[in-house]
């Protein structure tokens, strides 16, 4: 890296926006792949909802309820624009935004509703070996229920899914292809456009898990050419408990509801019900209006920073992180040793030391990382690892955070190194 590039990640104008980071300058928070921190604007938005318009949205004609409804619909429009879900005139395709609790629920919705609508015995559902459990288990279950086959796209030695692998696994038997945009363990960015092109050529639907991409890179659902895309607010500076599912209008119209109950119907008799139109059809019961409002605030905050600038800064942070880890001869990177191949996350191990021990000692040094299988056990089995350490960066990190991690890892080796060497 050049001195100018290092200077860009030394300067940090962002931490002041985050109360928990500003109040704890001694902490190097490197676990944003698990959950991001929240800026003051988001915290204040959620609080202001309860202070100024707390009412059940969609269910009242009085002012607070009307304002709560407007808050939800305003957030829906902001989120649509954030992921490029706009028509040719630039109008947000708000009705194609469905609120769930998280990405996991959104993917369960897709597997259940689209799976029931689409799959029959002998069909293929194609996913990748690098999926989070949330994009594996729902498909395992629906394949068992329908008699469909679950097929895995596998990586090459560079931790990439090759065009040849895409062509060989996505065949005319494929009916649904569901792939993560970015691996939550390796940080690998998959070529969604190429996978979607093959899926559509074979007559399959394309589903994208964008939980690890939406916080870090610009998203345009039309450019990706996907049919459904899911992500979580809490990984992109929003509150916990809010997920988002976008889908093509005609597909959402055709899919049956996932959950049933209040507000997702047009009419009910003693023996039947008529579903409400999308998105209400998929939003049974009372929504977390305050959380949705705060998610809208998170999107506006990120838009104000410019996602292209966030992507560039985080690329520099990932490159510096990989570069510094490579200076430690007792650390093995799990994944690519090219920093530019990592979006957000870098997995590694300290030779001979369990990741939980590494994480515990780093915690004593005010460095917060993740240790374990990261809800991606099939991937770790493929990599012949039982668990790894994972450091994940966000735009509010800086060079000092990574330097603090390296100092902490040296402390880990100081404690364990001699015992490991004598084994």
Task: Show which residues each predicted segment covers.
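Pyridoxal 5′-phosphate
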Residues: 1-423
